[in-house]
Amino acid sequence: MTRIKLSYFTIGLVALLLALALWPNIPWRNGQEGQLDQIKARGELRVSTISSPLIYSTEKDTPSGFDYELAKRFADYLGVKLVIIPHHNIDDLFDALDNDDTDLLAAGLIYNRERLNRARTGPAYYSVSQQLVYRLGSPRPKSFSDLKGQVVVASGSAHMTTLKRLKQTKYPELNWSSSVDKSGKELLEQVAEGKLDYTLGDSATIALLQRIHPQLAVAFDVTDEEPVTWYFKQSDDDSLYAAMLDFYSEMVEDGSLARLEEKYLGHVGSFDYVDTKTFLSAIDNVLPSYQHLFEKHAGDIDWKLLAVIAYQESHWNPQATSPTGVRGLMMLTRATADGLGVKDRVDPEESIRGGAIYLQRLMKKLPETIPEDERIWFALAAYNLGYGHMLDARRLTKNQNGNPDSWVDVKMRLPMLSQKRYYPSTTYGYARGHEAYNYVENIRRYQVSLVGYLQEKEKKAAQHAAIEAELGKSNPVVGPGWSIGD
């Protein structure tokens, strides 16, 4: 589990009480210039982080990540520009905080009691458990007593603290080491590639990386769930800290924090090794035949999202046919195809073009009150279920005091469309809402796999090209079949 167990009401209440308690220590009340004043005068909020799919990443210069989005919203709340400062390891993060080179750390950091003499933590925004991982196919250890190999964790991480405690209290024979050169993500990748026996990771990051490296397997949970939090410098100046607590309270109250958690963690729960392995194989062997068509017809939709929709529909089989008569890569009904001008549903280009147009029409048809970054999930539910049934799910949500514009609220009501207790009172009647729920969740998981897998391939290709270029410089060819040194 990666979902936080503390209620958002509790987080908001604690944040409010802390803000009130800190009120006397805010420097501007005594005529002094505090940290918040300095940030506003500078016009920048400096946030140190670590690159990771969950925390902060960039694809084609477009930043994303749970911590990035949360930090961006905090900077907007303060009315300043966000400046992201990436670091390679956790020790560097805290050094930057000590040296006043950053204003806060937003890097998916687990609460670590050993850090409290140097820094203080903000409210938790989700929770994770620490897990020991190994490569699938090698013997699975059931406890630290079963380890037969090397355990390496990232230097400065909470995993170091955990292993120290376990060695002192329960496993005196436990041997492990820390790496300054490798990040936690890189160590997890090394385990998946068979280059390292074991490491520790947090459950959320592991769940995401398994979509790209399905050989990465969880041996056992090392800890119960622990809060993930931002870190601030220990100081008598509480101005920035108090502003952060006010910001968190607003995020909790308006549901923004819950929606961010849903966006990045709501779909990572279940993992199917065979399904993931099959999909990654299809990326290499089948997708190249159709990628240019997805790119050509995607329009305002990310072509990779359009591609994973097609995979969910047909596994990229242009001849696919269901018992209900839907056909082709995008599995269009005859009526839908006719309305889109698709004459041959099993023609790959016609099917992709038709599916893209249909999805964009659904996006435009949605109520304007639905947030921009959540509209696609509502549109996909309508694509699978029918637009009217999706509206029924929104009405059910509103009737139960949920937010009909929030995907995290509406998706939980989709299965109710097939329950006798609810569907007789809906406008459009019975629908297989549980299938629509799984449909959207599967697409989100496939999207994580496709985006991450392609990024890994690009990174490896760039590394290979750099090595080739370096070899070319050190051994230049000066004649046919000759090189310097021959």
From Swiss-Prot:
Tell me how this protein sits in the membrane.
Peripheral membrane protein
Descriptive protein name:
Membrane-bound lytic murein transglycosylase F
Q: Which SMART domains does this UniProt record tie to the protein?
A: PBPb
Which GO cellular component term is one of those annotated?
cell outer membrane
- Per the annotation, which location comes first and is thus the protein's main one? membrane
Keyword terms: Cell outer membrane, Cell wall biogenesis/degradation, Lyase, Membrane, Signal
Q: Which family does it belong to?
A: In the N-terminal section; belongs to the bacterial solute-binding protein 3 family. In the C-terminal section; belongs to the transglycosylase Slt family.
- Role summary: Murein-degrading enzyme that degrades murein glycan strands and insoluble, high-molecular weight murein sacculi, with the concomitant formation of a 1,6-anhydromuramoyl product. Lytic transglycosylases (LTs) play an integral role in the metabolism of the peptidoglycan (PG) sacculus. Their lytic action creates space within the PG sacculus to allow for its expansion as well as for the insertion of various structures such as secretion systems and flagella.
Task: Please give the record's comment on domains.
Answer: The N-terminal domain does not have lytic activity and probably modulates enzymatic activity. The C-terminal domain is the catalytic active domain.
Q: Where is this region: LT domain?
A: 269-486
What is the organism field in this record?
A: Yersinia pestis
The entry's localization annotation reads: Cell outer membrane
